[in-house]
């Protein structure tokens, strides 16, 4: 590693494959505060033109170094409990230590001095769940990172 941010610029790839601006890559993390993440994340959704074969594009994206997973909307809705009307045709998740960007020219990383961090990937889901009192946990099969806020709120209200 040479210290440069490890980024897969998905919009650039799709522009090369499908033509400029034919597809649209949306990164839910859009905060341009470069000290943290430079508007790069580990999760992206892609809107494809009607003429594109989503399965072929997914297969192609899945072969790109740094990409952990590419799934279609139906699978993303089930796997991540997402609203189908608010995500694109494909969902992309990057590997650990890799971020996803739209286009190289849309991410100004010149001011990046601190190590880059990311959000939204599967490798960032494990969060320590530490409490200072006993709480009644549900009979859920597995707690997830976003459950921490729910249980912290309940504990604080007592």
Each PLM stretch: what is its role?
Residues 1-158:
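Feature captures the catalytic ectodomains and active-site-proximal regions of enzymes
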């Amino acid at each position: 590693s040479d210290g440069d941010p490890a980024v897969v610029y998905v919009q650039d790839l799709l522009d090369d494959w499908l033509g400029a601006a034919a597809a649209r890559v949306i990164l839910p993390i859009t905060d341009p505060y470069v000290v943290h993440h430079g508007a790069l994340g580990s999760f992206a959704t892609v809107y494809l033109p009607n003429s594109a074969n989503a399965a072929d594009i997914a297969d192609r994206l899945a072969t790109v170094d740094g990409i952990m997973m590419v799934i279609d909307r139906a699978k993303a809705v089930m796997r991540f409990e997402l609203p189908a009307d608010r995500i694109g045709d494909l969902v992309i998740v990057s590997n650990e230590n890799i971020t996803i960007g739209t286009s190289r020219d849309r991410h100004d990383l010149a001011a990046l001095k601190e190590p880059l961090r990311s959000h939204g990937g599967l490798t960032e889901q494990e969060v320590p769940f530490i409490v200072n009192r006993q709480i009644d946990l549900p009979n859920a099969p597995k707690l997830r990172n976003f459950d921490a806020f729910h249980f912290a709120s309940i504990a604080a209200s007592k």
